[in-house]
Amino acid sequence: MARAVGIDLGTTNSVVSVLEGGDPVVVANSEGSRTTPSIVAFARNGEVLVGQPAKNQAVTNVDRTVRSVKRHMGSDWSIEIDGKKYTAPEISARILMKLKRDAEAYLGEDITDAVITTPAYFNDAQRQATKDAGQIAGLNVLRIVNEPTAAALAYGLDKGEKEQRILVFDLGGGTFDVSLLEIGEGVVEVRATSGDNHLGGDDWDQRVVDWLVDKFKGTSGIDLTKDKMAMQRLREAAEKAKIELSSSQSTSINLPYITVDADKNPLFLDEQLTRAEFQRITQDLLDRTRKPFQSVIADTGISVSEIDHVVLVGGSTRMPAVTDLVKELTGGKEPNKGVNPDEVVAVGAALQAGVLKGEVKDVLLLDVTPLSLGIETKGGVMTRLIERNTTIPTKRSETFTTADDNQPSVQIQVYQGEREIAAHNKLLGSFELTGIPPAPRGIPQIEVTFDIDANGIVHVTAKDKGTGKENTIRIQEGSGLSKEDIDRMIKDAEAHAEEDRKRREEADVRNQAETLVYQTEKFVKEQREAEGGSKVPEDTLNKVDAAVAEAKAALGGSDISAIKSAMEKLGQESQALGQAIYEAAQAASQATGAAHPGGEPGGAHPGSADDVVDAEVVDDGREAK
């Protein structure tokens, strides 16, 4: 049975994990790291770089490098590169393809099935966009799982049979979630979840960038925001400073040649940022995590003293101010330090993949929908059919009627959110039910059914009870991608995968050819410079020289088959040279032996290693017969 992987598709970094003998293993990428930067770059030579290679060239290729694309999932955002538009699911698919390749290299087999995580507070549009990204990457997405739920699954499964309440505080690179779960006897049940899809480590970085821009403007009078390369260097320096301030009280930010003044003299940025100053300029961001926490506690109706464990998820929770706030909110409870905040979500996703594949037994995951779902009714009111924190999958129906006499159709507008006025919530989609027979208002009965699947994706049906006519919508407007769009993107992704494979093959062949040319040239040079001259005829060496020249000429072009052919010919000539050297050495040895027989000078000494003695191998302690 083909294996399934668990993928944490993060804003800043992504991780892939797989079950090995029932235990989750985090897969290292081709660069040797267990986390892959969620960055995609389009090099000017047409190559698509993903992960650390993309991050390494970001400063010199700002306009063609995409980071934090997760923040655009479910929107109509796109970026144009070389005249072609790329949507957020397409960019995310590049990251997923890289993780897929790394997992396949580790396992030595093809991967198609995956469980992908999303922030718990992602709406339907964002979940659908994530599923589309998986599909474009060539993955069969078994399930979309909430990140805090995956973390609790990874943390809580081995904590015994006793029922426990776990609070997961998840602050990542771009999103924030807090969830309260109950775990016991193999059942993982989410009681409530809340969050902010636009709050994460990126925002802390931006505050440091703004602080540096203001400081530099104050000392030099130059506004760095107009210089894209300078801003990219500031972003990287800000992230580094934030990380350093988690373990130090202050950090130096030194960026030489950040820009030039009016006289073209180079200017340097050199600032000292203390942890106290960093916490001061980011305090309001930290305070934004309080409301979702309080919302979860209120929704579950339990007190903080009843929480058994607090689990921190996401790299941003390493900031001391975040840890201190969590301790304050939970009444002094010490957060659990036994999990890796960068990897625990992917580990939980791999466990859920194991559950769905039957590798992990006796585990039931009960997740919830993070936001209420409903339709717009008369007066623009949001009428909820499914309340937030309802366990999924779920199905709810409610009967509505017409607002006007002889109304021939009804427009069903589906919203997600907590506001009382429908227009203030997120419009997921709309559809029309037509063919309603003429009747006074209030007489027709229209049954509206909401069905949320295990991925948290919504299906809505409207049915006229009188005629039996019905219409259904599967909410897809969020990603803005039709089936045709997705199919086209899958083909594009496959084409790029083939291009990438060819590029890798070409690089391997070139490397082999260059190595062979270098070694052969060195060998020929040694022969010509040998004491007493070369042992082989000059015409043999000339043939090798010609083959080397042919290989160099092929390497100067782009025809991979010509390089292979030249390398093959050079290999043959090199072998012929080796054979000639061996034969020359053998002939010289025989000539020397004939001139100096026995123990004479130049001959073999009696008892030397050249004497051959017949003997039997015998066990120790026994005589030879």
Swiss-Prot record:
Stretch list, region Disordered: 586-625
Keyword field: ATP-binding, Chaperone, Cytoplasm, Nucleotide-binding, Phosphoprotein, Secreted, Stress response
Note the superkingdom of the native organism. Answer: Bacteria
Residue list for modification Phosphothreonine: 175
Which Pfam families does the record associate with it?
HSP70
One GO biological process term: response to copper ion
Recorded coiled-coil stretches: none
Q: What induces it?
A: By stress conditions e.g. heat shock and oxidative stress under control of SigH. There is another promoter.
Give the UniProt entry's GO cellular component terms: bacterial extracellular vesicle; capsule; cell surface; cytosol; extracellular region; peptidoglycan-based cell wall; plasma membrane
Biased region (Low complexity) positions are 586-598
Give this protein's Gene Ontology molecular function annotations: ATP binding; ATP hydrolysis activity; ATP-dependent protein folding chaperone; fibronectin binding; heat shock protein binding; protein folding chaperone; unfolded protein binding; zymogen binding
Kindly give the InterPro entries that the UniProt entry links to this protein.
Answer: ATPase_NBD, Chaperone_DnaK, Heat_shock_70_CS, HSP70_C_sf, HSP70_peptide-bd_sf, Hsp_70_fam
Q: What broad class describes the main subcellular location of this protein?
A: cytoplasm
Q: Where in the cell is it found?
A: Cytoplasm; Secreted, Capsule; Cell surface; Extracellular vesicle, Bacterial extracellular vesicle
Do you know which PANTHER family this protein is assigned to?
Answer: HEAT SHOCK PROTEIN 70KDA (PTHR19375)
Q: Which family does it belong to?
A: Belongs to the heat shock protein 70 family.
Protein task:
Acts as a chaperone.
What's this protein's name?
Answer: Chaperone protein DnaK
Q: Which organism is it from?
A: Mycobacterium tuberculosis (strain ATCC 25618 / H37Rv)
